[in-house]
Structure formats: C-alpha cells, structure tokens
C-alpha cells in the first residue's frame, strides 16, 4: 500500500507542468514520501533521502495524473486507463452497489485501477434502466438514497424533468455534491435554473442558443423524438443538425448566463464529433491495431464491434448529414470559445463505456481541443486541477504541489509544444506508487460487474405473439405482425430458417413479409427474430442473439 511504502521516490531532470497553470519548471526535482508530494523544486536544490529511488526524466515532462470525468466503468478497463496516464475517473452511471465497491476496493489498494469517484444510478423518468423513477417524489427519494450510500456526485439522465431536477439538486447541494446532466427533455437554460452544475456532452445547449421560443421548442421536440427512437450504435444525426441551428448572435448571452451560474460544460468531442476529426482515418487504423493486440484479448467483442462500426458510419453519410456534421461542429467550437473567454470552465470527459476504449479517448479529446484553438496549458489544467476542484477535491488532488496526494505522470516530449506528447506515457505514479502500465491478458477484476443490458449494444429480442399464426398451403404472401420487445432497426425475422423482409415499426413491433414460396408446403415453421451485433449475450440464461421461438403452421388446402 502507498501509505506503507518506505522507499521515497525522486523524479529529476524533466520539465514540470504542475497543473496550476503557472509557467513550467525546467530541470525539476519532485520528492515523494509515502503517498504525498514532499518537495517540489529544481534538480540540485535539495538533498535526496539516501534510500530514494531516483527516476531520471531528462528530456521528458512531469504532469499531474490525468482525469476522465465522464466514464461508465467496466470491470476490464482498469489497466488500460492507467497505461494512458489516467489516474482518476468520475463514473456517471453504473449499478450503485458495484461501482461503490469498486471505488472502495481501489481506495483500499485491493484493486489495481484508477481512483474512482462515482454517481451510482443516473436519475430519470421512463428510460427503462437503473434509476428510472416516476415524478419528483421518487426522484428525491432516489437522490437521498444515493447520497446516503456515499456517492461523490449525482447524475440526471435525459428523461429527467424540471420538477425532478429541482428536488434532486436541492438534496445534492445540501450534501455538498454536484449535479451533472445528460439532458433530453430540458434545455440547458431550464436545467441550470433548476440546479444543474454541468452539461454532459453540452446537451440542451442548442435549444438555449436560438432567439425564437417556437424554434427552441421545435428543436427540443426533435431531441425528445430522437431519444424515443434512438437506436444504439447509430449516429446522432439529428443532434448534429441541432447544433448547426444555433444562432451565433446568442452566444455571448448564453455563455454569460452559464458562467454567472458557475456551470461547466463537458464538450465530449470524442462522443459526438469524432467523425468530424481530420484524423478520422488515422484513428480508425489506430483502433484496429489496438484491438489486434493479444495482450488485450479480454476486451469484450461489443467494444471492438462498437468502435469499428462507428468509423464506418462516416462512409454512409449523405450530403445533408455531412453538412449537419460540419456546420454543427464549427458552431459548437465557436460557442465553446465564447464560453471560455467569458470565464467558463471546461470538463474533460469522454463517455468511455462498454462501447468505447478507456484511456485513449482522453488523449483524443485533448487533440480535438487543440484543433479547436485552445492552448495545451489550459487543457492540462482542465484535465487535472479543474476536475479535482469541481468535485471538491482540489485540496488533495489535481496538481503537483507539496502536501498533495502523489499522482504524477512522466511523458516523452513536451505536451505544451505538441499535445500528442501526453500520449507518450513513460511512467505513472498513483497515490505514491509506481504503477505497472503494461497490458496483461490474464487481468481479472476481483469483483466482476453484474450483468445488465448495455446502452451500447443491441438488446436481446423477445417475441410475445405473432399474427396470423396459420395459413393454408399455396397461400399468397402473408403480412406477419410480431409483437414483443427489444426490436431495433436492423432486426430480421427468420421464418423456418430463412431470412424474410422485415420492417421495424417500433421497439415493440415488427412487420414481416412471408413470401408465397415459403407457404407452399404443409408444416410447422419456427419464427425467430435476430438483432444485429453487438448483442447482449453475456446473460447465462440467453446463449445467442436470437429471440425465443414462436410457431407458424401451414395446413392443408
């Protein structure tokens, strides 16, 4: 354990970028005793303990350990985060009992992983997942329960209404906790007026950046519709278009309002705008190489499929969609500059989840921000000091300063000159201990995450009934209605083992056309529904991506 470590550590000779925003210290020397920074100075300016382990950092840069403030943690992610220099994460949605057990296991030194702060269940109405509540009363009760369990912040999700958010925020703020929101049914302005502290993905912003109230309501209705019909694995095309509709002459007023309320924005370029990157093809190839690494064989297939499919989406975009993507991207960058110039604080989050690679996203977010015109110095402060201060941990974490917990990384090169140097990790020290940053194919988390359907894979379909369930031999084509759940665009009906034309009318209904040649022989035919991959198939009660069977009979004429 870090507190029991007897050998002090000295890192000497590199450039120190301490995370405070102050000018870097050349030829620095940093002394770590136990799990704390003891002395921060220059090489040769103080005596080293005789038994110190000395790490030479000549030509390298020392920085605080990095943060990712938007993660949906999975049990296999730990060492990948650490290998990318991410020493602290904020989890914004997981089963509360499991993520708090992970947090506490890491804090006790029992799990080799980044430090975890957690929100537990996200609070919202009608989304059918953990944290699904009805009305302000249930929302308040859940917030109180989560805070009683010791969560570090509270997350509200897309279907959280104004009344619900107000009582959740009051409860959270009374406990000294922040409220973070992935908005859907609320504009950013309405959410902030009801107590929101941070806009995850900058959600709700477009509707607040137009002057006409009817236009804003139309945009909000489009977002609600998108949420209701969203197929996980498909791009948020309409969302790009909403950002493209923002009116630039509103930007100063909106930015000033958010800053006056001390609201942060998490841009999350890697979540919404990755297809707008000029490094798109380079990153696609990089992902391919990463997933080919045999040391990472424990990464679930859903993550591989989700990542690689996301890049392929770009090749299918039509002209209108490309216009929405590019115009929305440009306007969002302009707004973010107005926001920062007005004094706004930016959170560095990636929405890392079962469908996205841990660690790598943080470095891509840095590159996005530099491409957008922000300075590496500011970005580093946002990803370290700013993150710690947002959670009220600034006295202990976030910077390389004497007395603080010793989270520090050493990178090859100078990220102030080239932000990509942040990805060239040489050494990671977390809580005063040198971290093994290698990958190990036998990595196992001692507390595996309980199975539950993923937001980043398709559901397992289930058939409740079919109609009709019978035809006579030699019939004309039959229009087969299938009711159930877990249906998505891309669901396919199999009739007697043969794929047939299928239309998804909703998540609970499919229409299939059974051609006449399949009705030419008497018999009992199996009807199944198969969803496209990746599908949640880890449930031991369900072995593949197909539904339960129903039966269709063809009788004698």
For every predicted segment, state its role:
Residues 57-110, 127-129, 134-137, 163, ...:
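Metal-associated gating/positioning segment near the N- to mid-region
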Residues 16-29, 42, 357-360, 375-380, ...:
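Acidic, glycine-enriched loop/beta-strand segments at the rims
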Residues 516-522:
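Surface-exposed, short loops/turns at beta-strand junctions within beta-sandwich domains
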Residues 452-492, 524-529, 535-557:
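Beta-strand/beta-sandwich contexts
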Residues 7-10, 16, 20-63:
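Histidine-rich, glycine-flanked metal-binding segment
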Residues 431-464:
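Extracellular/periplasmic ectodomains of large secreted or surface enzymes and adhesion receptors
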Residues 78-98, 113-123, 147-160, 169, ...:
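Divalent metal-dependent hydrolysis catalytic cores, especially in the metallo-beta-lactamase
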Residues 145-153, 160, 205, 209-372, ...:
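Active-site neighborhoods of metal-dependent hydrolases
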């Amino acid at each position: 354990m870090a507190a029991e470590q007897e050998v002090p550590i000295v890192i000497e000779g590199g450039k120190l970028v301490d995370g405070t925003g102050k000018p870097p210290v050349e030829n620095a020397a940093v002394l770590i005793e136990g799990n704390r920074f003891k002395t921060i100075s220059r090489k040769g300016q103080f005596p080293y303990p005789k038994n110190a382990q000395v790490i030479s950092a000549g030509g390298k840069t020392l920085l605080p350990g990095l943060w990712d403030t938007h993660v949906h943690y999975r049990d296999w992610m730990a060492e990948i985060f650490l290998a990318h220099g991410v020493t602290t994460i904020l989890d914004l949605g997981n089963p509360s009992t499991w993520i708090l057990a992970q947090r506490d296991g890491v804090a006790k030194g029992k799990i080799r992983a980044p430090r975890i702060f957690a929100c537990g269940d996200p609070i919202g109405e009608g989304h059918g997942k953990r944290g699904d509540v009805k009305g302000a009363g249930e929302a308040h009760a859940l917030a109180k329960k989560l805070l009683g369990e010791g969560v570090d912040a509270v997350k509200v999700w897309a279907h959280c209404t104004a009344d619900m958010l107000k009582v959740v925020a009051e409860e959270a703020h009374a406990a000294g906790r922040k409220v973070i929101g992935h908005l859907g049914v609320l504009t950013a302005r309405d959410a902030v007026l009801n107590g929101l502290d941070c806009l995850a993905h900058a959600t709700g912003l477009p509707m607040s950046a137009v002057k006409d109230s009817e236009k804003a309501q139309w945009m909000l209705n489009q977002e609600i519709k998108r949420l209701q019909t969203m197929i996980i694995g498909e791009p948020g095309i309409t969302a790009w278009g909403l950002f493209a509709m923002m009116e630039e002459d509103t930007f100063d007023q909106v930015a000033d309002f958010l800053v006056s309320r001390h609201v942060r924005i998490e841009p999350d370029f890697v979540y919404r705008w990755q297809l707008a990157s000029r490094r798109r093809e380079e990153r696609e190839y990089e992902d391919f190489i990463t997933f080919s690494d045999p040391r990472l064989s424990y990464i679930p297939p859903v993550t591989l499929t989700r990542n690689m499919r996301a890049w392929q989406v770009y090749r299918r975009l039509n002209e209108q969609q490309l216009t929405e993507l590019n115009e929305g991207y440009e306007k969002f960058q302009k707004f973010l500059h107005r926001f920062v110039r007005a004094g706004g604080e930016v959170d560095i989050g990636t929405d890392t989840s079962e469908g996205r690679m841990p660690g790598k996203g943080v470095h891509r977010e840095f590159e996005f921000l530099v491409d957008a015109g922000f300075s590496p110095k500011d970005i580093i402060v946002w990803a370290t000091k700013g993150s710690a201060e947002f959670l009220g941990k600034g006295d202990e974490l976030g910077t390389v300063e004497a007395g603080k917990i010793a989270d520090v990384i050493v990178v090859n090169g100078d990220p102030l000159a080239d932000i990509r140097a942040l990805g060239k990790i040489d050494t990671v020290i977390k809580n005063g201990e040198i971290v093994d940053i290698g990958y190990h194919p036998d990595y196992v988390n001692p507390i595996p995450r309980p199975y539950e359907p993923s937001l980043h894979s398709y559901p397992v379909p289930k058939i409740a009934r079919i109609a009709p369930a019978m035809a006579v031999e030699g019939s004309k084509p039959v229009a087969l209605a299938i009711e159930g759940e877990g249906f998505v665009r891309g669901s396919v009906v199999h009739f007697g083992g043969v794929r047939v034309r299928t239309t998804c009318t909703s998540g609970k209904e499919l229409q299939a056309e059974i051609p006449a040649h399949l009705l030419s022989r008497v018999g009992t035919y199996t009807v199944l529904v198969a969803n496209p991959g990746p599908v949640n198939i880890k449930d031991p009660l369900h072995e593949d991506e197909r539904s339960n069977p129903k039966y269709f009979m063809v009788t004698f004429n």
